[in-house]
């Protein structure tokens, strides 16, 4: 049998995203993740240490995926107002198409961001988007499309918040 550590690790991560998003941190079971990943618990502990670290890795991987997809938008090559519209549309559609991301965020929020606070990867993952947004705002301000003094981070929090709210509360709003 050929060992493929990166393939096994990714299968575990993919299985963890599904389990954690459907059952939450407390409800997800390592046995179920191992079954879904077609591996054993020992491999999960080998690659990720413990359940909390696996949850953090799942969260980080979903952030990385979203940021990679945002990078593919190439917003810096688009007129500022059109780029902003594209980002808002993308964010809404990303949450629509990736409900597991919303579910993982809900679970992490229940734990008061205890895992994300330990992450050394999430902030650096987010910086490029905020920097791109800041450049868009500057270009848009110079073109008379945006007001001056808009904070890129606060704007993104607003965009993500509006899009996230709908999906995180869809069951109680209907």
Mark where each language-model region is.
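Short helix-capping/turn signature of helix-turn-helix
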Residues: 48, 107-113
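Hydrophobic alpha-helical connector segments
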Residues: 71-103, 124-126, 130, 152-159
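Helix-turn-helix
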Residues: 11, 19-53, 57-58
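Short alpha-helical functional segments enriched in proximate histidine and acidic residues
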Residues: 19, 94, 136
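Short, structured helix-loop boundary elements
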Residues: 2, 9-10, 30, 52, ...
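Short coil/turn segments at alpha/beta junctions that flank glycine-rich nucleotide-binding fingerprints
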Residues: 22-26, 76-77, 98, 143
